[in-house]
């Protein structure tokens, strides 16, 4: 064999060995990639679900929050603790806070609110009612009662004479409103308030003028005996305000 043939054979052997090495490297690399892909595909995927399962039963335990500084008029916050059921699922704990309410304001609203079923018939004479029968007082509401409603008197029959006081009339007797007619823009409540102001001013002036007579306690008693009227010293201002601060109702019930 010549030297040329020997060198050619060596070159072919080296080329073959390098191709084998390259092939083996590619095979190993492909095997490693396949193994990595297989391992990655076999890894469990953790699914995240925000929604709670409605089928999972939950036990709710209410625990009051202890707070000594809280006033008695406010509703304490309630902590709701969700405990896992028998199936082993453990839902997250939830905190539910109730809005505090003012019990004093609520009680005042409850006292001022009267249900329609408990409203009694209002006495048509209001504060001017002279009846002292307990049965009448319990059967009909009077000024000062929560269910008292100030009546709006109906229009008198046609042909009744006009009230001599006109718009300045401050009468409240229902018989007067049946015997006399009043203008269309007549405001009885406003007239009575004006009358109350005049009465207070007159009483204040009388008190101021009577201070000079305090030095003589018995002076002038004989002069006032003729002007004495029973019940004239009774203060009716508060009763009048009770009546006219009440809610008006239709006067058709007083026909």
From Swiss-Prot:
GO terms for biological process: double-strand break repair; single strand break repair. Keywords: Hydrolase, Metal-binding, Repeat, Zinc, Zinc-finger. GO terms for molecular function: 3'-5' exonuclease activity; class II DNA-(apurinic or apyrimidinic site) endonuclease activity; zinc ion binding. One of its GO terms (cellular component) is nucleus. Displays apurinic-apyrimidinic (AP) endonuclease and 3'-5' exonuclease activities in vitro. Belongs to the APLF family. Pfam families: zf-CCHH. Its EC number is 3.1.1.-. It is an enzyme of class 3 (hydrolase). It comes from the Eukaryota. Residues 1-117, 131-168, 195-255 are annotated as: Disordered. PANTHER family: APRATAXIN AND PNK-LIKE FACTOR, APRATAXIN AND PNK-LIKE FACTOR-RELATED. Residues 12-22, 40-64, 137-150, 221-230 have a biased composition (Basic and acidic residues). Residues 207-218, 234-244 have a biased composition (Acidic residues). This is Aprataxin and PNK-like factor. Residues 1-11 have a biased composition (Low complexity). A zinc finger (PBZ-type) spans 121-142, 161-182.
């Amino acid at each position: 064999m010549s030297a040329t043939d020997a060198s050619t054979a060596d070159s072919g052997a080296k080329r073959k060995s390098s191709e084998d090495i390259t092939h083996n490297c590619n095979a190993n690399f492909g095997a490693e990639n396949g193994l990595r892909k297989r391992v990655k595909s076999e890894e469990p995927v953790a699914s995240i679900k925000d929604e709670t399962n409605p089928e999972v039963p939950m036990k709710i335990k209410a625990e009051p929050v202890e707070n000594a500084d809280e006033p008695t008029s406010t509703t304490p916050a309630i902590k709701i603790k969700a405990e896992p059921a028998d199936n082993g699922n453990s839902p997250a704990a939830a905190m539910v806070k109730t809005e505090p309410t003012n019990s004093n304001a609520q009680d005042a609203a409850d006292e001022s609110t009267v249900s329609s079923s408990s409203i009694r018939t209002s006495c048509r004479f209001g504060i001017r009612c002279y009846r002292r029968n307990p049965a009448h007082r319990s059967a009909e509401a009077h000024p000062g009662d929560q269910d008292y409603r100030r009546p709006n008197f109906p229009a008198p029959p046609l042909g009744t004479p006009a009230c001599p006081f006109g718009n300045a009339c401050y009468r409240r007797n229902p018989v007067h409103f049946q015997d006399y007619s009043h203008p269309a823009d007549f405001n009885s409540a406003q007239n009575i308030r004006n009358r109350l102001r005049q009465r207070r001013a007159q009483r204040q002036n009388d008190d101021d003028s009577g201070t000079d007579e305090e030095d003589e306690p018995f002076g002038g008693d004989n002069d006032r005996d003729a002007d004495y009227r029973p019940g004239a010293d009774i203060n009716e201002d508060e009763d009048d305000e009770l009546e006219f601060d009440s809610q008006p109702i239709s006067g058709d019930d007083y026909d």
